[in-house]
A protein has these predicted regions:
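Hydrophobic alpha-helical membrane-insertion segments, chiefly the h-region
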Residues: 29-38
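Intrinsic-disorder-associated, low-complexity terminal segments enriched in Asp/Asn/His/Tyr and depleted
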Residues: 2, 8-9
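Extended ligand-binding groove/face enriched in aromatic
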Residues: 79-81, 85-87, 92-200, 383
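Structural helix-adjacent loops and short alpha-helical linkers that scaffold large soluble proteins
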Residues: 40-51, 96-112, 155-169, 210-223, ...
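Well-ordered alpha-helical segments within folded domains of soluble proteins
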Residues: 81-97, 140-156, 194-210, 250-269, ...
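Extended ligand-binding clefts on enzyme/binding-domain cores
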Residues: 143, 182, 193-321, 334
Length: 399
């Protein structure tokens, strides 16, 4: 009797899951048909839109990460999302200040406040192994320290007399020394877990420190990319793997959410490797639908399901993070056609919530709390870094 009920329950749940994913997929398929009659053109956010998006993030950052705040709420899903909401907002503010000098002072103030929140216990605490309040660089996690160091570098660029300069030097120095003595070549995000994309953030931060101060820390990035080229590419695709063990041996295959993330930060210290990985990512993990291009979480797999924390829900193997990060890569690397395709795809999946002064986002069809992470990520993704220019690319076979 119990076995029969359990079997009935499994069949029912399977049917409900299939129905749910069909409901998710149907609007996308209809949109593809409608969109196929027009040609994509990348359109950066307008100034009024940017103002509202910045206003929302400024309010969230100003409220801090204490109980009852949006940052605390997003952190209930995973503490990483609180940190990323702050760090990617800072990267976006820095990009915007590079385009609009009139925003520079405000960007500096917002970045300073974001760093203050990132140093607070609710954000910092989940990443600590050992911690001394006077020296945040004793935190073990490269995930936390990498983003903190890059945020500090952004503040130093925006405010040359940054009050955080000593901390920036301390954190960058600690990271550099750890990379020098790490046999695996990649530092830990958590105990026993070494993800390549988390390390690319820290290495981008070290390269940025070198540009700002003349330090030798960019050498760590050069050593890392040399090893990545030799040891951390998949034999069949050439794509960088996602994770290595304590000896530096690959332990997890290439994944769209990891690649998309890593390529953007790679471009900050090795433009050649970033461009190569971007082309391979597009070739092996994406499908061209004319005016849309969609990226899979795992090359060659078309699974539909709940996915995991990094991928989120999968529809025929395609994931939201893989496509969001691919948009950022396309904008940063100047691939205007692909940026337009991905911008349109992202627009199909997001629901805009707008007031007279603010703008934030939700997810269509499913109830998935994403604010303020979605706002920070999309603002970062849609704004080219300083010196980048979104430009048309020559036509390519299979583009």
């Amino acid at each position: 009797m119990h076995k029969s009920l359990a079997r009935h329950y499994r069949i029912r749940m399977k049917f409900q899951l299939r129905r749910r994913w069909l409901l998710l997929l149907l609007p996308v398929l209809l949109a593809v048909v409608c969109a196929s009659f027009s040609r994509p053109e990348y359109k950066p956010p307008t100034r009024p839109e940017l103002r509202k998006r910045v206003n929302y993030l400024a309010r969230v950052i100003g409220e801090g990460a204490g109980p009852g705040t949006p940052l605390a709420a997003i952190g209930e899903q995973t503490p990483e999302w609180t940190l990323f909401s702050l760090s990617f907002a800072v990267y976006a503010f820095t990009h915007l200040a590079a385009q609009d000098s009139g925003f520079r002072a405000e960007a500096g103030q917002l970045t300073g406040r974001a760093i203050e929140v990132a140093l607070s216990e609710p954000v910092r605490g989940p990443f600590e192994y050992v911690y001394r309040p006077e020296w945040p660089d004793t935190t073990r996690s490269v995930l936390y320290l990498g983003h903190l160091a890059l945020m500090l570098g952004c503040h130093r660029q925006l405010a040359p007399n940054s009050r955080y300069a000593p901390l920036h030097d301390a954190v960058a120095g600690a990271l550099y020394r750890r990379f020098e003595r790490e046999p695996a070549g990649c530092l830990e995000s958590y105990r026993g877990q070494r993800w390549l994309p988390d390390n690319t953030v820290a290495l981008a931060a070290l390269a940025w420190h070198s540009r700002l101060t003349g330090s030798p820390y960019a050498a760590a990035a050069r050593r890392w990319t040399a090893r990545a080229r030799q040891q951390w590419r998949e034999p069949g695709t050439g794509l960088l793997v996602s994770q290595v063990d304590s000896a530096g041996r690959p332990t997890e295959e290439a994944r769209g959410s990891m690649l998309g993330w890593g390529i953007w930060f790679l471009a900050q210290f090795d433009a050649e490797l970033a461009a190569e990985q971007y082309a391979l990512f597009r070739r092996h993990a994406s499908t061209n639908l004319g005016v849309l291009r969609v990226y899979r979480e795992r090359p060659g797999r078309y699974t539909t399901g709940l996915g995991d924390l990094d991928s989120g829900p999968l529809i025929l193997g395609y994931s939201i993070p893989a496509n969001t990060f691919a948009l950022a890569d396309a904008v940063a690397l100047g691939d205007a056609r692909n940026a337009a395709r991905l911008q349109r795809l992202v627009a199909l999946g997001r629901r805009t919530v707008e007031t007279s002064t603010e703008m934030r986002y939700g997810v269509r069809v499913v109830d998935l709390p994403v604010s303020p992470l979605a706002e920070a990520l999309l603002l970062w993704a849609e704004l080219p870094p300083a010196g980048a220019r979104v430009r048309p690319r020559p036509a390519e076979a299979g583009q």
